[in-house]
């Protein structure tokens, strides 16, 4: 992977892991309402579910690459389009609402939620088909990057849980500006895929 593509990969994965989404909001809510220690079960369920979903995404993306390598080039365009769509959604979304507080859930519920979490499914397929499979189709690399993607996602969840009220205040005061900056960084990611 070239340094430019690697920088786009890290930018995409970190922004996706750290921007608001179902997991991060749930982690924030659980830690804010019940403390970090009480939210560990929720975080553990999310993390294991995230890993399983990333491995499933690896299997799907790898299988498509084996069936027809030209699909990977097409998926790169689809991935870039998704990244641009995500940038648009982030740039035009309102700041987070600190009044929205879902009830904390347990390990198995947070594990199961990963299988319907469209954000992480698209995150996995986009990262693998856009940044990894065009460079290598070695199964050990695909699996290794899938594990890395799950670790990055877990990092994002833990950051939100640890930050608790601090992130709520930042999004309340600077949410629009932060959303625009994150959106511009995602546009950078989409451009770096091809140049």
Curated annotation (Swiss-Prot):
Q: Which domain of life is it from?
A: Bacteria
The record's keywords, sorted A to Z, are: Amino-acid transport, Cell inner membrane, Cell membrane, Membrane, Transmembrane, Transmembrane helix, Transport
- Entries under InterPro entries matching the protein: LeuE-type
Give an example GO molecular function. Answer: amino acid transmembrane transporter activity
Residues on Cytoplasmic side = 33-46, 91-104, 163-176
Disulfide-bonded cysteine pairs: these are: none
A Gene Ontology term for the protein's cellular component: plasma membrane
Q: How does it sit in the membrane?
A: Multi-pass membrane protein
Q: Which residues cross the membrane?
A: 10-32, 47-67, 70-90, 105-125, 142-162, 177-194
Q: Provide the GO biological process annotations.
A: cysteine export across plasma membrane
Tell me if rRNA processing is a UniProt keyword of this record.
no
Protein family according to the UniProt entry? Belongs to the Rht family.
The protein's name? Cysteine/O-acetylserine efflux protein
Protein's organism: Salmonella paratyphi A (strain ATCC 9150 / SARB42)
